[in-house]
Amino acid sequence: GFVIAYAYDPRWRTTLNLKGFFVRRLVRLHPMVLLSAVIGAVTFSIQGGVQWNGTQVSTSALMLALLCTMFFIPAVPGSYAEVRGNGEMFPLNGPSWSLFFEYIGNIIYALVLRRLSNKVLTIVVVLLGAGLSLFAIADAASYTSIGVGWTLDGVNFGGGLLRMLFPFSMGMLLSRQFKPMKISGAFWKCTLMLVALMAVPYIPACAGVHLNGVYEMACVIIVFPLIVKMGASAGNSNKLYHFLGGISYPLYIIHYPVMYLFYAWLIDEKRYTLAETWHVVVPMYVALVVAAHLLLKYYDEPIRRYLSRKWVK
C-alpha cells in the first residue's frame, strides 16, 4: 500500500488512467507469475515420494493446474485442478495466494481507495484494523494464527481479504502522511527488529484469550508500520540494498516449488532437525538466491522493458 500510493497517487492527476495503471501492474508482476507456474509444474511432475507424488497425477490435471496458476484462477479444494491435495488455491505454487489478493488490492485501490480523502481513509483503516483484530483474537479460522487466505473457503477468503486490505490501506495512509524521521542505520535496525519479531515462538492461549493473535496484531498494527516508516526514512542506498530489493520478488515467487521438493525429502528421509538437514538447506538457500538474481537480470527485467516499450504509454 505504501509503495503503490507513493508511486501512483500523484500520477492520477496528470498522466495515469485505469488502463495505464492495470497495464503497468501486469507488466511489473505477471512475467514472473508465468515463469513460476512453469517451474511449479516441472517440480511437481518430477516429485515422487510419500508426500505429494506428482508422478501419479494425470497430464490433463497438471496442465489445467498450470493454466489456472498462470492466469490466477484459484482452484477449489478437491477440484480436478487442485492436484496436490492440500486444498491450496494454487497447488503448483502455494504462496501465489498472497499475490492473488494483492491483485485484488490493486483493483480496489484503482477503483475506490485512491479516491478517498485522508479522513475517510483513516476511518477505513480503523474499521479494517478492528475487523482483523477481532478475526485474529477470536481465532476465527481455528488456526491459532492469522495464517489464512491460502485456500478457497469462506473463512480463508474473508480472512485473506482482511489480511490484505488493512495493511494495504494503512500503507496508503502512511504514504500520504509520510514525514521522514531522523534515523541512522535504518536497514540494520529494521532487519534486527524483523528477526526479533519472527523469533518469537507461538504464544498459547490464556484464560480463553488467543494471545498469539494479540501478538500478531501488535506486530501488524504497530511494529510493521513503524518498520516501513523507518525504512522509507533512510534516505540512502547502496549495492546491497539494491540487490536485496531486486531479488525480493523473484525469490518470493520461485522459492516454494523448490520447498515442496525439500518438504517431501524431509518426510521420506524422516529428517527434521537442522543438524540433519543443513547440508541440503544451505546449498538450497544459496541456489535460490542466485536463481532469483539471474532470473531478475536475464528474464524479468528484459521482458518488462520490452513490454513497457510496447504497452506502457
State what each model feature region is.
Residues 1-9, 98-114, 128-184, 215-236, ...:
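Specific transmembrane alpha-helix
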Residues 9-50, 56-72, 105-106, 159, ...:
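Transmembrane alpha-helical segments and their boundary/interface "anchor" motifs
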